[in-house]
């Protein structure tokens, strides 16, 4: 099965998890080139929407992500990537980019 890059204007939403803990580490985007580089290198590559450039995760910080598995969703437009991280996924130094709780309104 191949990803469908047409649905998301050339980008796949990519959910990255820790292969051992199953924790969600981050959400990023892949285009066709970053997808191919990820397959070829065994490490995560993404497309930076803000910088409009390819991004080898951890190349600067040393917090690389070794790919263990990649799974497409049923619509082939979202990718789940399980990794062995070499450090925190978040640029803030947190293990995961998801560390800001949202308070729910009571009775909502």
UniProtKB/Swiss-Prot annotation:
- Annotated residues for binding of Zn(2+): 74, 90, 97
What is catalyzed by this enzyme?
Answer: 1-(5-phospho-beta-D-ribosyl)-5'-AMP + H2O = 1-(5-phospho-beta-D-ribosyl)-5-[(5-phospho-beta-D-ribosylamino)methylideneamino]imidazole-4-carboxamide
Q: What is its main location?
A: cytoplasm
Q: How is the cofactor bound, in the record's words?
A: Binds 1 Mg(2+) ion per subunit. Binds 1 zinc ion per subunit.
GO MF annotations for this entry?
magnesium ion binding; phosphoribosyl-AMP cyclohydrolase activity; zinc ion binding
Going by the UniProt record, its keywords in alphabetical order are: Amino-acid biosynthesis, Cytoplasm, Histidine biosynthesis, Hydrolase, Magnesium, Metal-binding, Zinc
Give residues annotated as binding Mg(2+): 73, 75, 77
Q: Where in the cell is it found?
A: Cytoplasm
Disulfide-bond pairs as recorded: none
* Gene Ontology annotations for the cellular component aspect, listed alphabetically: cytoplasm
Keyword Magnesium assigned? yes
Which GO terms of type biological process are on file?
A: L-histidine biosynthetic process
Q: What is its EC number?
A: 3.5.4.19
Zinc listed as a keyword: yes
Short name of one Pfam family:
PRA-CH
Q: Where is the signal peptide?
A: none
What are the names of the required cofactors?
Mg(2+); Zn(2+)
Q: Which Gene3D superfamilies match?
A: Phosphoribosyl-AMP cyclohydrolase
Q: Quaternary structure per UniProt?
A: Homodimer.
Protein's UniProt name: Phosphoribosyl-AMP cyclohydrolase
- Its encoding gene is what? hisI
């Amino acid at each position: 099965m191949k990803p469908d890059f047409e649905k998301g204007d050339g980008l796949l939403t990519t959910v990255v998890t820790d292969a051992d803990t199953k924790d969600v580490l981050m959400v990023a985007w892949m285009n066709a080139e970053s997808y191919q580089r990820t397959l070829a290198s065994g490490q995560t590559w993404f497309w930076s929407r803000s910088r409009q450039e390819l991004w080898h995760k951890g190349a600067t910080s040393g917090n690389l992500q070794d790919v263990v598995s990649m799974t497409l969703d049923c619509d082939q437009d979202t990718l789940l990537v399980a990794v062995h991280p070499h450090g925190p996924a978040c640029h803030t130094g947190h293990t995961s980019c998801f560390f800001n709780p949202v308070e729910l309104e009571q009775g909502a």
